[in-house]
Each structure stands twice: as C-alpha cells, then as structure tokens.
C-alpha cells in the first residue's frame, strides 16, 4: 500500500504540465515581463532622462538626480507588495493583476508624453518622480502577485519549478527594453533619439499594456483563493496575520536583509550602474553601451 502510494505520488510529480497550467505560467510570466520592461526603461535611458528633466543642473548633479529618481521606484516596491498583497488577499489575484498592470502601463506611457524641464520647469521632474513611485508600487504588487498566482495553480511537488518561470521575467524585461531602445536608436539616429526618439520606447508600452490586459482577462481566479472565499476562510486581516506574528515577521526580515537586499544591490549595480557608468563616465556612445549590456545578458 505504501509502495503504491509512493509510485502514485512519483507519477504525479513526473507528469507534464497540463494545457491550463502552461497558459497560467505563460500569461503570468508574459505580463510580468512587460511590467519589468516598463520599469527598466528608465534605468536603461537614465543618462538621457537626466539631460531632459534635470537640465538646469551641472552634469554630475544631473546624473545623481536621475539615479535618485530611479531609486525612488525601487524603494517603494516593498510598500507596493504590502498594499497590493492585501488587495489580492481580499478581492482576488486576477483583479489585482489588472490594477497593477494598468498603473504600470499608463505611468510608463505618460512618461513618453511628459514635457521636459525646459518646457514646464520644476513640474517636469516632480511629475516624473511621482510616476516612478507609481511604477514601483505597481511592480511591487505585480511580482509577488504573479508568483502567488502561479503557486496556487501548481500541483504538489512542483511549486518551485512552476514559480521559477516568474524569476526569469526580470532579465527578459531588461533585455526587451534594450532591444527596443537599440532598434529605435538605429531608426531615428543618435541626435534625434536624444531629442525626442527616447520617448518612443515609453509610448510603445501602451501596445504591451493592451496585450497584457487581453491576456489577463482570459485568466480565471486562483483555485486556492476561490475555494477559501467560497468556504468563508479568506483572511480578514492579512497584514496583521503576516507581520504581527513574530515567527512570520522574523522570516520576512531574514529574507529581506539576508537575501533580497543583497541580491538587489548586485543586480542593479551589475546591470544599470554598469550601463550608466559606460555612458556618463567612460563616455561610450549610447548604442554601444546598450549593445554591450544586451549581449552580457
């Protein structure tokens, strides 16, 4: 009997993905790739954005402000995870997905339309930073939400494998942003790209937003959440349950300080500061710098 149970469990784990499981992983991953694309465009174009929105300052100060604006989106991501994690626990994963992707896509599109500092003065960088904050909040909710959604569709013994696809989306989103930037630079030429062509990758995000919304609307609610809701077992105070318990809070702090924080420093230094350093310090032309980072991925 025990041997038969073991064989059954092994057979279930070795079975391939179902069509529905593949669609859940593809839809969740693709939408998250597009969100990373939106988030990383700023970092990939930080030197040009600094010249457009902080033009009143010397080059060194301009570069610092451009990096600080990029950091603003990064710093609010944990708050996005808290806010949208709570929303997801109350109203469901699917609708939270739609909210986060709409916030991210529209914020990115507006950056492409935003007048620079020479046109509207201090309002330009102020609005830019506000949009970066919205992007950070949206991404904070999206990334964890996507992993949770996929995990709740995963059969026993395959949760780590299924959610691992979500972990590839950050690199794919950065790569996609660099490819679009390289194509636009080639099509417009460097001078036109620095003047107005840099806006095109931001405006293109509205097309990706449309695709993402269409895909997300085809998804069903998470079966785990739906079952908890039907049985009246959904959490009424998810934040309190997660953080008021020291045993849970200790794990969160350990993961944040011991793992995620260090990983974030290494990743952003290796990709974005390297790109920024190539262009601003070593004076490598933008096309070559983008190409080098894209090849390194």
What does each of the following model-derived ranges do?
Residues 46-79, 97, 122, 126:
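Extracellular/periplasmic helix-loop-helix junction of adjacent transmembrane segments
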Residues 67-86, 103-107, 172, 294-297:
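Central cavity-lining transmembrane alpha-helices of secondary-active solute carriers
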Residues 217-239:
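Flexible cytoplasmic inter-helical loops of multi-pass small-molecule transporters
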